[in-house]
């Protein structure tokens, strides 16, 4: 856990994976709110590192898929189904042998998603979906090389 309170810490994205590695993390889950120029963009997105040279691509994809399914189950949205995307995002690069995903919980630039994000019930369900997925899948994918 890199934050334990609401204090904002400006840590460059390139350093976040390094911090996880230095801490001996078994898993990296980075949680964000998304935005887009198109106000119709909506729903959750779960990204994993699809670079074939990354040693934990399969484990990361498994975690991302399970996470998207659990988000859809616990946070049904009238806006969109969660999607999983293999990507080359800076946040997911440099994680070495740590399975890692980036969760964009919603699009804050979409009116319906933003309304959901303000709901304490929705926040609790999203947190539960993420925590349940970590708990259910971590044992099977968190093995050090």
Regions found by a protein language model. Name each.
Residues 30-38, 47, 80-145:
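Active-site-adjacent mobile loop/cap segments within catalytic or ligand-binding domains
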Residues 26-28, 53-56, 70-73, 126-130:
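Glycine-rich loops and low-complexity Gly/Arg-rich segments
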């Amino acid at each position: 856990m890199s934050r334990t309170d609401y204090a904002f810490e400006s840590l460059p994205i390139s350093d976040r994976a390094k911090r996880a590695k230095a801490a001996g993390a078994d898993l990296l889950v980075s949680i964000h709110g998304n935005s887009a120029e198109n106000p119709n963009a909506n729903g959750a997105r779960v990204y994993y590192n699809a670079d074939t040279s990354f040693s934990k691509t399969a484990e990361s994809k498994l975690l991302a898929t399970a996470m998207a399914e659990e988000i859809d189950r616990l946070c049904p949205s009238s806006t969109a189904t969660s999607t999983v995307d293999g990507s080359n995002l800076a946040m997911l690069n440099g994680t070495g042998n740590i399975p890692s995903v980036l969760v964009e919980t919603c699009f804050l630039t979409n009116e319906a998603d933003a309304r959901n994000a303000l709901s304490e019930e929705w926040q609790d369900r999203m947190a539960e979906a993420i925590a349940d997925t970590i708990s259910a899948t971590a044992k099977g994918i968190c093995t050090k090389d």
